[in-house]
């Protein structure tokens, strides 16, 4: 089992534990154990569908006898009235898995929809939209999957798969040069092949990075579009560039047209609205 699947399985198990506890007494009290039925996932809002594959895992993990028929796959554009899948099996199982499946699919689809909207805003530029670590605790793997489904690019998954020297790291390390030098020495000593990105707050810090080198990407933190254009010119294609901080949907293209390679948007995962859908007997 790979790490991603292990995280998803643990999330599903924890979610069932917190929701069902010692039993779904509503369902157990009024639905016979032998009752069989089927329910459909009905889309009620236009957007990008995400989470179908995870939903299948929710059903399989709770009750392997449930039969799932998928009509619309992850990444597809959906409209109100569409039926994404039909699930058949024990009615008790349908009722006990309904809320977890909807919670996951609505959130993932909301993230994919917003990401798609942001990436569409960048059409005609080479800039790609990035997610961040501003995710729901325990759900990061699903939220980052949704960003990819929506057409965005995953930044680092966590603190373990990339070195990102933020302002606090630089300040505590004693400056740009010490932060970069120590990061490179650490990777060499530990045998880690990690990309190094550094955040700069002004042109002086940017020039220090350019003079020292040793990084893969430079992040411009809270730069205006005018500052960003100048910063991109200073970098001159030597390193990947990223804009971050206070960038909204309305200002997104202004930054992209400055020539940055990436724009990171925390709102993709921390301020998203779930896509409306329901799971009803059919």
Region locations from a protein language model:
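Acidic/glycine-rich phosphate/pyrophosphate-binding loops and surrounding catalytic core
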Residues: 1-212, 217, 226-234, 239-240, ...
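Active-site glycine- and acidic-residue-rich loops that bind
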Residues: 138-140, 245-248
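Glycine-rich beta-strand-to-loop/alpha-helix junction loops that act as flexible
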Residues: 220-221, 241-247, 265-267
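Active-site loop ensemble at the mouth of alpha/beta enzyme cores that anchors a bound cofactor
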Residues: 278-282
